[in-house]
Amino acid sequence: MAAGCCGVKKQKLSSSPPSGSGGGGGASSSSHCSGESQCRAGELGLGGAGTRLNGLGGLTGGGSGSGCTLSPPQGCGGGGGGIALSPPPSCGVGTLLSTPAAATSSSPSSSSAASSSSPGSRKMVVSAEMCCFCFDVLYCHLYGYQQPRTPRFTNEPYPLFVTWKIGRDKRLRGCIGTFSAMNLHSGLREYTLTSALKDSRFPPMTRDELPRLFCSVSLLTNFEDVCDYLDWEVGVHGIRIEFINEKGSKRTATYLPEVAKEQGWDHIQTIDSLLRKGGYKAPITNEFRKTIKLTRYRSEKMTLSYAEYLAHRQHHHFQNGIGHPLPPYNHYS
């Protein structure tokens, strides 16, 4: 299911902050934004199955708080089914039932990679090739070329977010993802275009913006239901909350692992921000916070600039089946 930021029916997930804050994209899945206030990654309004998440903090299709809304993915071509979270045993921790096993992908040293998983536990799955593929897909779409063929990286199913930032200050330009586990080849292809062209907080991307873009791919892992709303670590876990608002409606919202740390928030500030993003209007009390159902998760993230993308294409031959040459970087400047 794809997710948005602030809980609405069939929302999109975006991992960025509301458009009013200069960024966007948060969903009930994950999504990373930089520490800019615009990029409060991961707010999401989870509706039902088949919803998209705007992981940067906002509903992609309306809802409260200029966030992102969750909407069913159009033409979703990935597999893997939805993520099944085991119910929290009494007061224990529920684990993600559909987490892929033993993925093997290394992250190139020339790219920026971040993972909230414990170091050395396993190889990173996210890779620079995934960001290159996203750039390939967007480039081909904007220039009318045939879409790139099947990439060479793993096609295992993961919940994922694709985030676009632009300019030297890395302003949020689009961020949408899904908490449903999708096969990476089709999932990245779909959410590359969805985040670039259909994030309701921004106009569709144009060719002129390509040279200034940064692409981030986030893969979400290790989902755990917890009993205590404080049982998560700032900078390590992303969180998804579910609560009943003052009108008796169920709402959800999410922030990616990097959001709270980038914003300088503690646990309470993060929870309260998520409640507001999820549309909760009443005064927030400690008693109400205790009624929240919280799921924590981790993520792996890779970021690549357009210039790095061209360098990888030229020097590492990440062609991904494209049958046309990319023009030199100066062509766009």
UniProtKB/Swiss-Prot annotation:
Matches recorded under NCBIfam families: TIGR00296 family protein (TIGR00296)
Chief localization: nucleus
Disulfide feature: none
Disease implicated: Midface hypoplasia, hearing impairment, elliptocytosis, and nephrocalcinosis: An X-linked recessive disorder with onset in early childhood, characterized by midface hypoplasia, hearing impairment, elliptocytosis, and nephrocalcinosis. Variable clinical features include anemia, and mild early motor or speech delay.
Recorded GO CC terms: mitochondrion; nucleoplasm; nucleus
Name used for this protein in its record: Nuclear protein AMMECR1
Designated gene of the protein: AMMECR1
Compositional bias of kind Low complexity: 28-37, 101-119
